[in-house]
C-alpha cells in the first residue's frame, strides 16, 4: 500500500521504516532539506537500535524515500500520516500549528480519497480540528474530495521502538467509519497477524488513550519516588519495598524503580498537556498536579544529597556524571534529569566531567563553550580526579564497574547513585561512601 508520512522525526522515521519493511511503498516528507538529504545518504539523526539498518535496507529496496516535495507526498499516499512535533506551549498545552499546517497542505493538494491519520501526540479534539482544516481548505479550492480522519496514537518506547512497532501490544484506531477500520486493519495486518492487537474506538477516546497511558506510567514513577523519600526518613529500604509490592500481580514490577525522575520528549510534556486539557474542561487534576511537582523536585534529589555531604559547599568541586540521556539506549536529553543536575551544579560553582556512551554529541551541542562542563572519553576518565561520582542514567556498562579502580581515581571516594544500581554493602567494602535513593539509614534524607 502507498503511505505518506509528514515528519521525519522520531515517530515518523520509525513508522516509515517499519511500514516499508512490511512491503509498503513509503514516502517521508519533511521541510528540513538538510535532514532529508542526510537521510537519503543513510545518516540517521537519532539513536535508535536497529533503525539505521532498517532505513538502509528499505531505501536500497526502493520502498522508502525521503523528500521535501509535499505535493508529491500528498499525491502518493492513500494513507497520509501526520507525525510532526506538538511542542508544549508556555501554559503546558500542545502546540498544534505544525499538525494543522500539514492538514492544510494535504487539503490543498489532495485530488482523490485518502485517510488522514494523526500519529502526533495531541489533545482530545485534534482530529476534529484536522477535519475542519481539511474541509476549509477544500471548500476554498471549490473541490469535493472524500477523506476520513483517524486517530492512531503511537506507543513507542525510545530504545525499543522497532520491536514495539513490529510486535505491538496494541494498535489503537480511533474512527467511526467501518470502511476506514478495514483499511487500517489491512495496513497493520503484518504486525498483528499472530495476535489481533487492533483496538477500535471512537476518535476522542483514542486521543485520550495516548495521554492516559503516559500519565499512568508517569504516575507510577512519581509515586515510587515519593515512597523512596518516605523510606529514607523512616529507615526503610525502598528496594526491599519494591520487591514486596511488585510481587503483587495487581501492581507488577514495571515502572516502580525509584530514581531521579522522568524526562524525555513524552512523559513531562504529556502530563502537562493533560493537566491543561483538564483545566480547559473545568476540572482540577490533583493527582496529575502532584505527579508533575513530585517529578520536578525529584530531579534535584542528587544535588540536595551533594549539598548535605559537602557541608562547606560545592564551589570548586569536580563532579563526575555517568549518564546524560534521559534513559538508556537513546541519545535523547530532552528534559533529562541530568540537565537539571548540570544546571544546579554549574550554578553552585562546581565543575562537571560527564560521560554518556551515546548522548555525547547531543551534550556537546547543548553545552559547547559552557564553562565548567567537560565531556570525557569514557566512564573512568570522567571519574579521574573528581570529588564525587553521580550516576544519573542506568546504562548497562555502569552496572558492574571496577570499584577498586574508582576509589583510586576519585579524589574523594563518594558515589551518588541516582538509579540504585549497586548493593550498598558491597560498595562499602571497597571503602566508598555510597548514597542512593530511598535506602533508609544509608544516607540523610534529602
Predicted regions and their residues:
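Structural/interface elements that position substrates and couple domains in central-metabolism enzymes
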Residues: 1-446
Amino acid at each position: 500500500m502507498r503511505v505518506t508520512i509528514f515528519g521525519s522525526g522520531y515517530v515518523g522515521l520509525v513508522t516509515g521504516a517499519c511500514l516499508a519493511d512490511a512491503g509498503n511503498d513509503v514516502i517521508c516528507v519533511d521541510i528540513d532539506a538538510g535532514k532529508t538529504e542526510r537521510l537519503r545518504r543513510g545518516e540517521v539523526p537519532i539513536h535508535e537500535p536497529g533503525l539505521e539498518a532498517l532505513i538502509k535496507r528499505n531505501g536500497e529496496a526502493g520502498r522508502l524515500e525521503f523528500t521535501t516535495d509535499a505535493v508529491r507526498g500528498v499525491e502518493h499516499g492513500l494513507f497520509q500520516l501526520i507525525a510532526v512535533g506538538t511542542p508544549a506551549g508556555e501554559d503546558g498545552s500542545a502546540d498544534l500549528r505544525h499538525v494543522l499546517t500539514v492538514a492544510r497542505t494535504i487539503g490543498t493538494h489532495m485530488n482523490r480519497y485518502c485517510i488522514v491519520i494523526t500519529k502526533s501526540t495531541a489533545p482530545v479534539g485534534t482530529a476534529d480540528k484536522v477535519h475542519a482544516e481539511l474541509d476549509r481548505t477544500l471548500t476554498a479550492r471549490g473541490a469535493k474530495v472524500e477523506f476520513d480522519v483517524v486517530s492512531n496514537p503511537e506507543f513507542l518506547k525510545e530504545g525499543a521502538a522497532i520491536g514495539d512497532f513490529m510486535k505491538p501490544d496494541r494498535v489503537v484506531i480511533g474512527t467511526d467509519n467501518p470502511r476506514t477500520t478495514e483499511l487500517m486493519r489491512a495496513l497493520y495486518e503484518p504486525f498483528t497477524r499472530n495476535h489481533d492487537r487492533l483496538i477500535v474506538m471512537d476518535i476522542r477516546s483514542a486521543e485520550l488513550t495516548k495521554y492516559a497511558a503516559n500519565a499512568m506510567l508517569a504516575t507510577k514513577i512519581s509515586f515510587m519516588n515519593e515512597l523512596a523519600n518516605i523510606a529514607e526518613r523512616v529507615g526503610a529500604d525502598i528496594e526491599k519495598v519494591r520487591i514486596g509490592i511488585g510481587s503483587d500481580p495487581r501492581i507488577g514490577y514495571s515502572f516502580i524503580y525509584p530514581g531521579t525522575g522522568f524526562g524525555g520528549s513524552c512523559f513531562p510534556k504529556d502530563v502537562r498537556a493533560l493537566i491543561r486539557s483538564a483545566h480547559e474542561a473545568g476540572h482540577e487534576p490533583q493527582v496529575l498536579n502532584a505527579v508533575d511537582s513530585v517529578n520536578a523536585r525529584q530531579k534535584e534529589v542528587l544535588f540536595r544529597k551533594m549539598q548535605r555531604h559537602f557541608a562547606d559547599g560545592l564551589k570548586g568541586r569536580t563532579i563526575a556524571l555517568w549518564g546524560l540521556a534521559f534513559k538508556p539506549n537513546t541519545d535523547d536529553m530532552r528534559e533529562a534529569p541530568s540537565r537539571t543536575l548540570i544546571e544546579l551544579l554549574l550554578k553552585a560553582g562546581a565543575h562537571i566531567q560527564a560521560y554518556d556512551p551515546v548522548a555525547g554529541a547531543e551534550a556537546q551541542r547543548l553545552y559547547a563553550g559552557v564553562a565548567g562542563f567537560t565531556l570525557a572519553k569514557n566512564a573512568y576518565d570522567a571519574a579521574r580526579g573528581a570529588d564525587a561520582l553521580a550516576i544519573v542514567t542506568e546504562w548497562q556498562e555502569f552496572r558492574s564497574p571496577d570499584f577498586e579502580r574508582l576509589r583510586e581515581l576519585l579524589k574523594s571516594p563518594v558515589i551518588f547513585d541516582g538509579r540504585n544500581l549497586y548493593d550498598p554493602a558491597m560498595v562499602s567494602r571497597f571503602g566508598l561512601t555510597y548514597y542512593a535513593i530511598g535506602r533508609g539509614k544509608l544516607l540523610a534524607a534529602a
